[in-house]
Amino acid sequence: SIILLFFYHPLYQNYTSLMNTSFSFFYYIWCVLLTLSLCLTFFKVTSLKNFIIFLSLFFFIGLILPYHKNYPIFSTLHVFIPLSCIIIALLFLAYLIKNKQKSEPILAHKIYLWFSYGLSIIAMFIIFFSQINGLIEISVLLFINFILYVLQRSWDIHIAYLVLSLMNRTLNFLK
């Protein structure tokens, strides 16, 4: 995802803007890799494989639909489908964290706090920029992968704190 930042300005555009340029090939490769990566990472933390495959397919279909003023229906679906899939994925992460409370209540509470912090940061970015741009897209992807990583590994939360602090400092620097 970060490599694609060299092809557009993340504060003013999002990844979809690559679809309408000569770099569209990279956009489609990114869509495939992103979908596979998220799908395989979710497989490591849950046994609901059919649900994840269904969600991943819808996410991919939404990403590859054309976003162009000549195709308003496709443009609407291009925005609505991936956004819905991300919201469902975030709700599913909250569900996984809730289930983690049964086996590791203290760790689950700490993960839930990180989950809340991440959602707050993303909401702050959406309010601040008043549109979905590349920075928000990258933040959401990093956030989902971070929570999945912590759920998968169940490592000490201090390591997770260092990673999130580094992300926060980097994002503050970009402002």
Model-derived segments and spans:
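Membrane-helix interface and helix-disruption motif detector
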Residues: 17-25, 68-82, 128-137
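Hydrophobic cores of alpha-helical transmembrane segments in multi-pass inner/ER membrane proteins
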Residues: 28-40, 85-95, 140-153
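Cytoplasmic-side transmembrane-helix entry/capping segments in multi-pass membrane proteins
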Residues: 50-53
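Membrane-proximal helix-loop-helix units in multi-pass membrane proteins
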Residues: 56-108
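N-terminal topogenic module of multi-pass integral membrane proteins
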Residues: 1-44
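Aromatic-anchored segments of alpha-helical transmembrane domains
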Residues: 2, 56-65, 118-127
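Terminal transmembrane helical module of multi-pass membrane proteins
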Residues: 104-171
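Transmembrane helix-loop junctions and nearby membrane-interface residues
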Residues: 5, 9, 42-45, 64-68, ...
